[in-house]
Amino acid sequence: MLACHHNCKHFGICGGCSSPQTEYELSLKAKELALHNLFSPLIPSQKILPVIPCSPILRGRNKMEFSFYQTVDGEKTLGFISPSKPKKGIPITECLMIDERAIDILNYTRSWWATHPELSAYYPPLNKGSLCTLTVRIGNVSNDFMIILTTSGREEFAVPLSVIQEWQKTLLDSGLPITSIFWEEKLSARNSPTTFRTTHLYGEQFLKQQLSIEGRSNIFHVRPRSFFQPQSRQAEKIIQTIKDFISPTGEETLLDLYCGAGTIGISLSPYVKKIIGVELVPDAVASAQENIQLNSANMEVFLEDAKQFCRRHEHLPPLDIVVIDPPRCGMQNKALKYLLRMSPKKIIYVSCNPLTQISECSILVEHGYQLQRMQPIDQFPHTHHLENVVLLERLSF
């Protein structure tokens, strides 16, 4: 396991890492113990497999979002916002979780911002200000970068295109391996869902990520708003765990709920008869459809809310396997209700939030399912977060 001999200079104040980088093994044991205690009412400890450590434990993140921030006195920072009260902007100059060149991009953006004092940082509670976030995504095929600048879409805080183009030129003149640059305008209004207007400024429309399972490699095109697991090597371990848990014969139909860009379904497609993917985010569905063609996968994807899809298909014969990888908030009660009516033989529940996961697994157990195996996988070293893969099987039909 890779050792870290020093802590990041921002440790303890930025809110990113909750345990010292020099104490990874200790933090891993603490996560494992907490998970055992949490799930002990539902599954014997011998069915919980040892946590799979993160590898690498440093600079493995393929995505990082940085926030623009300013105080009431006008002091401006670009980096993270501390969890302390009152909140503080932390001008990040080092981060051991991501490629060092991401910090270079941060610095070039700071320099550009300094030449435009008229641009204020966005303040979400009042929906005021111009500059929201800077997102850096890194592809593992060519180790190249996608940069996304998010600004306010409100007319009174709009950033002129000419100013955005100055930022673009600053980045391109840096010599960094930037594959694509996007500008997003955040359209937010009271009592309305937040949407984004995206402008492609430079380069490719997507970033390339590669995942390999048992010697089979797939290439995935990831767009600005597509979800992709934040640690590519850990994503492979998640998918391998799912494959091992379901023990496919090649004759199964697998429903992949919250399928995102199709990473799980496409990776599993050689092992089952058919994959059906369901995803609500149009950008992710576009990526999934592109990735299906790119990898010649036997998968069909639907642009639909998981709850609506399950409700429409609740009276069909029981599916063989359902894989759910929902947001941190979980499936929610109604979606879970319709999933239960579909009565799949096996359910794989992947979650980055064990608290939500155990709540919904408890409901599944109450309705005839049993937890058979559990595999925790560390995706966020030096934090309290832990990815968890659970196999549930229906006891009777």
From Swiss-Prot:
Main EC class the enzyme belongs to: transferase
Gene Ontology terms for molecular function: 4 iron, 4 sulfur cluster binding; metal ion binding; rRNA (uridine-C5-)-methyltransferase activity
EC id: 2.1.1.-
Any GO BP: rRNA base methylation
Domain of life: Bacteria
Keyword Metal-binding found: yes
Pfam families per the UniProt record, alphabetical: tRNA_U5-meth_tr (PF05958)
Keywords: 4Fe-4S, Iron, Iron-sulfur, Metal-binding, Methyltransferase, S-adenosyl-L-methionine, Transferase
Residues engaged in binding S-adenosyl-L-methionine: Q229, Y258, E279, D325
Catalytic residue positions: C352
Keyword Transmembrane helix included in the entry's annotation: no
InterPro entries to which the protein is assigned, alphabetical: MeTrfase_TrmA_AS (IPR030390), MeTrfase_TrmA_CS (IPR030391), SAM-dependent_MTases_sf (IPR029063), U5_MeTrfase_fam (IPR010280)
Residues bound to [4Fe-4S] cluster: C8, C14, C17, C95
Family: Belongs to the class I-like SAM-binding methyltransferase superfamily. RNA M5U methyltransferase family.
Name listed for the protein in its UniProt record: Uncharacterized RNA methyltransferase TC_0118
Record organism: Chlamydia muridarum (strain MoPn / Nigg)
Classification lineage: Bacteria, Pseudomonadati, Chlamydiota, Chlamydiia, Chlamydiales
